[in-house]
Design a protein with these regions (language model features):
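The serine-hydrolase catalytic nucleophile loop
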Residues: 65-77, 270
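Conserved alpha/beta-hydrolase "acid-adjacent" motif
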Residues: 265-271
């Protein structure tokens, strides 16, 4: 670990969050991920990892716009590792413990490229199959990464939200104004030179439904590395207009699995259905 690198070792938020999880999901001295760092275009990208050279497959896990890599490592990365997989949880630039390159204005397109480059990096190490898992908005991100990279064996998403669709924006936005005008406002801000203006992601998005426990939500909303994070208008513009390298009608890279939460108050399944039902060339499983 680099001496000056940011680390979860002393971060308070995730430790408070894990108290809301069952005991077997909580980290301790004997059960916790290793923190790694990977340089991508001058971004010191933080990875939580459970390395296992005997694992037959790797799973790279992606957070959404209200979480970070440590949070998903607790609920999915660690449990998958216990079941014999090698898991890698990435903090995308501006989230978690990743130190963003100050010379870059990070966009959602950068997230997709970063994810694709991480797949390439892992494939350089060995030829074991790689699967992608995405939490919340990370579900659509893993589709975008797979469409760009084309070298993954399967994608798993909690949701698959195509923000280009008006119904998706209206349902997942914090209110009607942001649902109707958010994309236009972001575009206008970029056009007049305010693309670097930052707002909390909780302003345009329905972050109040991120988790169902009110006390846990307070902790996450106060955490500037996850639900309390700020993004630029340029990131927001890129997020709601991103065009995948392969549209769903032509996607033939790998099977898709939807793991829809039963009590999801933010992203109902019909939003994912509208996207997944367009995928006819690969097996699509919904749970």
């Amino acid at each position: 670990m680099e001496e000056s690198a940011m680390t979860y070792e002393n971060q308070k938020a995730w430790r408070e969050i894990q108290t809301f999880l069952p005991k077997e999901y909580q980290y301790n001295a004997d059960y916790k991920p290793t923190e790694e760092y990977w340089n991508w275009k001058g971004n010191n990208v933080h990875l939580d990892t459970f390395r296992n050279p005997d694992a037959k497959a790797k799973v790279i896990c992606f957070h959404g716009v209200g979480t970070n890599g440590r949070q998903i490592s607790m609920i999915i990365g660690g449990p998958l590792a216990k079941n014999g997989f090698e898991t890698i949880m990435v903090d995308m630039p501006t989230y978690g413990m990743t130190e963003a390159n100050p010379k870059m204005r990070i966009t959602y397109a950068d997230w997709v490229q970063c994810g694709s480059s991480l797949v390439d990096e892992e494939l350089k190490k060995d030829v074991r199959p790689i699967f992608l898992y995405g939490l919340s908005a990370g579900g659509m991100e893993v589709y975008h990464v797979a469409a760009k990279n084309k070298n993954v064996k399967g994608i798993i998403g909690m949701t698959f939200l195509d923000q280009r669709e008006k119904q998706v924006r209206m349902t997942t936005a914090s209110n009607t104004f942001w649902g109707i005008a958010g994309a236009l406002l972001a575009k206008l801000s970029c056009a007049i030179g305010f693309g670097g203006f930052k707002i909390k992601m909780s302003i345009p998005s329905k972050m109040k439904t991120l988790v169902n426990d009110r006390e846990c939500l307070k902790i996450m909303m106060a955490d500037s590395t996850s639900a309390g994070n700020k993004v630029t208008m340029q990131f927001l513009q890129s997020y709601v207009t991103y065009v995948p390298d392969i549209e769903p009608e032509d996607f033939s890279v790998c099977p898709i699995l939807l793991t829809q939460p039963e009590r999801d108050g933010w992203t109902p399944q019909f939003l994912s259905d509208s996207f997944l039902d367009k995928n006819k060339k690969v097996p699509v499983t919904k749970t």
